[in-house]
Amino acid sequence: MKDNSKLIHELRKVVGRKYVFTDSLNKEPFSKGWRYGEGNALAVIKPGILIELWDVLKICVKEDMIIIMQAANTGLTGGSTPYGSGYDRPIIIINTMRIDHIHLINDGNQIIGLAGSTLYDLEKKLKPIGKEPHSVIGSTSIGASIVGGVCNNSGGSLVKRGPAYTELALYAKVNKNGELELVNELDINLGKSPEEILINLQNKNYTNLDIIKSKKLASDDKYVEIIRDVESKTPSRFNADKRLLYNASGSAGKIAVFAVRMDTYDIPKKNQVFYVGTNDSKVFTQIRRDILSNFKTLPTSGDYLHRDCYDAAKKYSK
C-alpha cells in the first residue's frame, strides 16, 4: 500500500494542520451524508481561500487522488460523500464551507457566490436591498450552498424560476493531458494566471468596468415557457436534461467550481401560501393544469404532501 504521509504533509502546509482531518472521528461528519451516502476517505481538507483550494487540487491531481468536492453535505443528492467501498484509489474530500464570500454586482441584480457560500447567507445579504436569491427552497435552512445547487440543477419545487442554472462560472478541470486547468467564464476581467484570477476574486479586487455585460445566462430563462406547456409529451424537469448542462451547471462533481455568477430577483410585495387538500389525486392534476395554463403569475413553488406530512408539520414544525 502506498505511503501517503508525504501527501498529507503537503496538504497541511497549504491549509494548516487544523484543517486536515485524518482520524475517523473528525472525518465522519464529512464522509457520511446526513441523508444517505457513506464511505472512507484518506483525508478531509478545508481550505479557507480560493488560492488554497487551487493548491490543494494541484497536489491531489498530481498524486492521482479521487477528489470529492463538498460544501454543506446535506446528503440530499448523495454526491458529496464516498459511497461504499471498492474505489481504486484513495479519496480526498475537499470541503469548501470556509470559502463563503458573496459579492453583490450590477446594483444587486447579480451576485458572485464563492465555493462555500450558502443560500441562507445570500438571503440575508439581499434582503436589505429588496432582493432574493433564485433558489428559495427548503434546504436553505440546512445550509445548502449556492454552488452545490448549480452543480445539481437544484430547485425541483420551484415553479416560476425553474432549476438553478448559470453559464457564468469559475472552475478547474483536468484537461486531456492530465493537467489541472483553471477556466474563467465569469465574464469578469480578473487577470491571466490562475493565482492572479483567484486572489483578485477572493479580495474583490475588480471594478464595475471589469464586469462584462454578458450575453450568457445567469438563470434559466426558458423554464416558464416549458412548464406552461401542459400538453407536452416531455416532462418539464428530468435528470441529465442536456438543456441544463453547461460546464459548471449540472456538473455534479466532475469539475471543481470556485465561484458562480447568478441573477437575483425582486422580493414580491405580497406572498400567500395555500394548502389544498383532496381525497382524489385527479383534482390536483386538474388544479396544476389550470394554474400552469391560465394563471397570469405562476406560483413561486409547489409541493405535494402526504396527509401524514401535513399533520406532522402542523404539530411539530412551529
Where are the model-predicted features located?
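N-terminal flexible segment immediately upstream of the FAD-binding catalytic core
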Residues: 1-58, 75-111, 138, 262, ...
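Short amphipathic alpha-helices in soluble, non-transmembrane regions
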Residues: 7-11, 60, 287-293
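Short, structural beta-strand-to-alpha-helix junction motif
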Residues: 49, 74, 110, 116-122, ...
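FAD-binding subdomain of flavoenzyme oxidoreductases
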Residues: 120, 127-283
